[in-house]
């Protein structure tokens, strides 16, 4: 049975989700969990986009033991140089080169002829192949590319040394039957004396990303690209956890399997949710809270008699656990540090001391501590470090609020606000500290775990009216009002960072496949 390589681009394409911005430490933690999940290749980022993007790719490449690491590069020599430098510390370094091939992209975005595109493919793939052993090539907007020219572009890349050919459905345009035919045509007609592996990369604009990816596998693709929880710009990308479980459950049909350790699926999905600030929908396939819930009495009766009557997937298969951790108020620092290691949470002596102190405070308030609680503690700490501000105090008096913030220079800001309710008053007080032009797009509070004593994660989404950029921010605390203040403070800090730095670092927020 064929084993399909799984290529995760949560840290590159997934981060293009509006409002999502992972810190470097969060990216490294995610990469380590992806390795634990046994992802074949991690696309760690677009290393030429900014110094932070380069550093994130480099740190991930240096941190992993067995997982291949790749960086995205346009068909531009300087991009490739940056990518090569960033991934050189990886045990298995790869480079992913792309250029658009559809008529609309060549005419309006690239403003060059098809002949020039082919010359660029040959030059850049050859240049990359001289520097790393494994090169992947993607013809951007492949599904709107004339089929014979697509074959010509693919053949040019293969002749120049590409081992992997990725066929992106960049705008989520294709259908399963059509996509499968494209793969069969390319696989049958691409000439090479070595093995060439094709892969799908699907966006979910028409809700068919997973179906299209599976159709490509059925047609002969040996690698599949996607993101955890399907995160990504617009409607998102193909959800890798859905593809993996579909291959597992229907291996009789696809005659293929994933390399993933499926029992790490839930933990991986939860980590991405925590760090991205995007809650997993309750009805989400595979990892949603309702994926194994049965409301109908007939269904409940059947499941109690034999789970296979209505469940084709067991919670245990994907690592959904209902037991709490053997950690509590009497647990010591050593046991706590071992749990952090088990959860792939990076720490040093200083951060361990801070996290352990927060853990002990939580254990005094909460009887049962879960993995999600530990992730929430870490998320709250990394967000605070990213922000450079801490919330010293918040006081509520009816519709009035007083907040006290402190920055890294130990400067203290005290502000009062009055609003239609407690949260509105807190936000207005924080607005006076930062004085940004913001629009609050969404505000939500989610319990980290079940129970009346659960920690809460507060999520806010704001628009910087000066630039139109959307930012997601989160605050984690046992107190919902305090968590709300932290989240809104963090959102303001992200806006402040953008206003100070501008967008000069970024090549393009949407320049990718």
From Swiss-Prot:
EC primary class: transferase
Pyruvate carboxyltransferase domain segment(s): 4-266
Pathway: Amino-acid biosynthesis; L-leucine biosynthesis; L-leucine from 3-methyl-2-oxobutanoate: step 1/4
Gene Ontology molecular function: 2-isopropylmalate synthase activity; acetyl-CoA C-acetyltransferase activity; manganese ion binding
Cofactor: Mn(2+)
Places the protein is found: Cytoplasm
Effect of residue 23 to C: In strain: IL1403
Binding locations of Mn(2+): 13, 201, 203, 237
Stretches the record annotates as Regulatory domain: 390-513
GO biological process: L-leucine biosynthetic process
Catalytic activity: 3-methyl-2-oxobutanoate + acetyl-CoA + H2O = (2S)-2-isopropylmalate + CoA + H(+)
Enzyme Commission (EC) number: 2.3.3.13
Pfam families the record matches: HCS_D2, HMGL-like, LeuA_dimer
Alphabetically ordered keywords of this record: Amino-acid biosynthesis, Branched-chain amino acid biosynthesis, Cytoplasm, Leucine biosynthesis, Manganese, Metal-binding, Transferase
Cellular-component GO terms for this entry: cytoplasm
HAMAP family (UniProt xref): LeuA_type1
Reported function: Catalyzes the condensation of the acetyl group of acetyl-CoA with 3-methyl-2-oxobutanoate (2-ketoisovalerate) to form 3-carboxy-3-hydroxy-4-methylpentanoate (2-isopropylmalate).
Entry similarity comment: Belongs to the alpha-IPM synthase/homocitrate synthase family. LeuA type 1 subfamily.
Subunit structure: Homodimer.
PANTHER family assigned: 2-ISOPROPYLMALATE SYNTHASE 1, CHLOROPLASTIC-RELATED, HOMOCITRATE SYNTHASE-RELATED
Identification of the protein by name: 2-isopropylmalate synthase
């Amino acid at each position: 049975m064929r084993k399909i390589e799984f290529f995760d681009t949560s840290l590159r394409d997934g981060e293009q989700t509006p409002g999502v911005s992972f810190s470097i430490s969060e990216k490294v933690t995610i990469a380590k969990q992806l390795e634990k999940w046994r992802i074949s290749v991690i696309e760690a980022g677009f290393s030429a986009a900014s110094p932070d993007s380069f550093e994130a790719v480099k740190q991930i490449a240096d941190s992993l033991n067995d997982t291949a690491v790749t960086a995205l590069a346009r068909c531009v020599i300087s991009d490739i140089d940056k990518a090569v430098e960033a991934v050189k510390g990886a045990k298995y370094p790869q480079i992913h080169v792309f250029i658009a091939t559809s008529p609309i992209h060549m005419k309006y975005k690239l403003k060059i002829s098809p002949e020039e595109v082919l010359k660029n493919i040959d030059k850049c793939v050859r240049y990359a192949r001289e520097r790393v052993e494994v090169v992947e090539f993607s013809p951007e907007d492949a599904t709107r590319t004339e089929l014979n020219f697509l074959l010509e572009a693919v053949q040019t890349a293969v002749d120049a040394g590409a081992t992997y050919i990725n066929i992106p459905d960049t705008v989520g345009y294709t259908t399963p039957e059509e996509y499968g035919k494209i793969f069969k045509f390319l696989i049958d007609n691409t000439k090479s004396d070595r093995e060439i592996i094709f892969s799908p990369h699907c966006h979910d604009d028409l809700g068919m990303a997973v179906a299209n990816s599976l159709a490509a596998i059925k047609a002969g693709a040996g690698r599949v690209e996607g993101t955890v929880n399907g995160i990504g710009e617009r409607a998102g990308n193909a959800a890798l956890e859905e593809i993996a479980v579909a291959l597992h459950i229907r291996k009789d049909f696809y005659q293929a399997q994933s390399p993933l350790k499926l029992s790490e699926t839930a933990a991986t999905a939860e980590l991405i949710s925590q760090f991205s600030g995007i809650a997993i929908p309750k009805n989400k396939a595979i990892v949603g809270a309702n994926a194994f819930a049965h409301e109908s009495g007939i269904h409940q009766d059947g499941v109690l008699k034999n789970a296979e009557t209505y469940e084709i997937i067991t919670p245990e298969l994907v690592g959904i656990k209902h037991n709490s951790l053997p950690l509590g108020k009497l647990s010591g620092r050593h046991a706590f540090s071992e749990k952090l290691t088990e959860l792939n949470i990076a720490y040093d002596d200083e951060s361990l001391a801070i996290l352990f102190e927060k853990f002990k405070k939580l254990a005094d308030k909460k009887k049962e501590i879960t993995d999600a609680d530990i992730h929430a503690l870490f998320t709250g700490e990394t967000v605070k470090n990213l922000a450079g501000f801490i919330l010293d105090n918040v006081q509520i008096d009816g519709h009035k609020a007083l907040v006290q913030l402190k920055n890294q220079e130990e400067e203290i800001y005290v502000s009062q606000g009055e609003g239609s309710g407690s949260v509105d008053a807190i936000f207005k007080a924080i607005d006076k500290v930062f004085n940004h032009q913001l629009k609050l797009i969404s505000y939500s509070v989610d319990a980290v775990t079940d129970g009346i004593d659960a920690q809460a994660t507060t999520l806010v989404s704001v628009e910087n009216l000066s630039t139109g950029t959307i930012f997601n921010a989160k605050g984690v605390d046992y107190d919902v009002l305090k968590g709300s203040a932290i989240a809104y403070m963090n959102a303001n800090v992200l806006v402040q960072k953008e206003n100070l730095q501008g967008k000069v670092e970024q090549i393009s927020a949407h320049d990718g496949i």
